[in-house]
């Protein structure tokens, strides 16, 4: 099913799998068979170092030009990461990489896990989804590819001459009804 997303994007991708640690399974490539092959036979086992794996993925993007996004498929639980969610978000903000989260089989009652996946997506300019069955992935991949293809890059130069390197919030409003604008929550100068 990831093949559907990669076919639609006609871009490059890498595959990083994780359990108790992240592992680069397929380096950045535009060869769909390599990515599809890397996905074959994956199964959940051992712990889930979710935050460490996201940070690892963000570092992998260092030096990669163009639009960059992470598609995170997970049950949302983190077990044993050295990083916490706030540190992970800090890395994501600095990297400027959108995170799209797909929560797999997460009960509505597990609100904390849902909240974390939603936060990772929304604060990085991505989007979150929750599904019960993998048959729903095709529709999600369509939505993600449409969104990635419909992005615009806006540049802004602050008049704030302060040399402070603190996080600065961004507020973007669209002056036309019926349009939805999504952006990163902020940036570091």
What are these regions (language model features)?
Residues 1-189:
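Scaffold/interface architecture of coatomer-like assemblies
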